[in-house]
């Protein structure tokens, strides 16, 4: 199955697992915004430290604007394979198409590592 058009780069599974772990830690010790509307607002206000986007969102238009907006605001973003697992990492009973980490809390070191890896994947030097 091919990736949706909004997925701009491939994220290895082990990195996606670290992203979900960071979301869980940030939920418990920092601050996160759940859902695409809240995530979009956090990015527009340049408050997000990291944006997480699920790869299996239908229709794609729900999150298609996020990578471009993140690039424009210079906010790092990363993908995870499943909106269901992203929702669970946020402590929700439902799926989450996207999440913004506002304050990573105890996940700060993990978030820094994720951002560094994402920049390497995207071919940028950090």
From Swiss-Prot:
Family matches, as InterPro entries: eL8/uL1-like (IPR050257), Ribosomal_eL30-like_sf (IPR029064), Ribosomal_eL8-like_CS (IPR004037), Ribosomal_eL8/eL30/eS12/Gad45 (IPR004038), Ribosomal_eL8/Nhp2 (IPR018492), Ribosomal_eL8_arc (IPR022481)
Keywords per UniProt: Cytoplasm, Ribonucleoprotein, Ribosomal protein, RNA-binding, rRNA-binding, tRNA processing
Compartmental location: Cytoplasm
GO biological process terms on file: ribosome biogenesis; translation; tRNA 5'-leader removal
SUPFAM superfamilies documented for this protein: L30e-like (SSF55315)
A GO term for molecular function: structural constituent of ribosome
GO-annotated cellular components: cytoplasm; ribonucleoprotein complex; ribosome
Main subcellular location: cytoplasm
Keyword ATP-binding assigned: no
Subunit and interaction comment: Part of the 50S ribosomal subunit. Probably part of the RNase P complex.
Membership in a protein family: Belongs to the eukaryotic ribosomal protein eL8 family.
Physiological role: Multifunctional RNA-binding protein that recognizes the K-turn motif in ribosomal RNA, the RNA component of RNase P, box H/ACA, box C/D and box C'/D' sRNAs.
Protein name per UniProt: Large ribosomal subunit protein eL8
Organism: Sulfolobus acidocaldarius (strain ATCC 33909 / DSM 639 / JCM 8929 / NBRC 15157 / NCIMB 11770)
Lineage: Archaea, Thermoproteota, Thermoprotei, Sulfolobales, Sulfolobaceae
